[in-house]
Amino acid sequence: GTPYLENLVSTTNRKLIKLFDRDDVAIYNSIPTVEGTLMMVIQHTDYTIHGSNVMVLGFGRTGMSVARAFQSLGAHVKVGARRSEHIARITEMMFSPFHMQDIEKEVGNIDIVINTIPHLVVTANVISKMPAHTLVIDLASKPGGTDFRYAEKRGIKALLAPGLPGIVAPKTAGQILANVLSQLLAEDVIARKENGE
């Protein structure tokens, strides 16, 4: 949390729950995020997802969902990761894996790049090796992981799209949080009963 929240929690003897850091919230939120990503790709390209070459950067909760969705629509999906267990899972799920340090070698035939890594990975060097028609969708939290200034200079369309759940499916996004909060409150009631409060 922020220093203000951390201070508030320590001075009031309260518990801070970082909802958006929770695995369950992130996994549920990956559903509207994927739908929003598909919507953006369809809006900003003049070719089908089917048969296109898609590169997903990061294989966390969102990256995995994005890769699966694009593969299920017939895209050829390459996934970049750093951790060996992610490379193994990428391989097991029938995506084409690559190590992030090799991104410059891998991007030469890519139509769509979808970044989920919240630090600069789509650098000027990477962008300079992309085909001119490549679309970059950056799902990482602000400021994203893309050199947007260089992309614009090169004529590559690069879009920063954090917070898609609240934009494309606000009712679902609210329901996800309501469900998790209800679960947390129920767990708290049970814990208090067990502690005799």
Locate the predicted segments by residue.
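Rossmann-fold NAD(P)-binding glycine/threonine-rich loop
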Residues: 1-21, 25, 139-186
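Glycine-rich helix-loop-beta junction characteristic of Rossmann-like nucleotide cofactor-binding loops
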Residues: 44-49
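Rossmann-like adenosine-cofactor binding region
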Residues: 90-166
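Hydrophobic anchor at the start of a short beta-strand
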Residues: 16, 77, 97
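Glycine-rich adenosine-cofactor-binding loop
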Residues: 50-71
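Conserved Rossmann-like nucleotide-cofactor binding loop
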Residues: 62, 85-86, 142
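NAD(P)-binding Rossmann-fold cofactor-contacting core
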Residues: 73-93
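A glycine-rich, Thr/Ser-enriched phosphate-binding loop motif common to dinucleotide/cofactor-binding enzymes
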Residues: 23-42
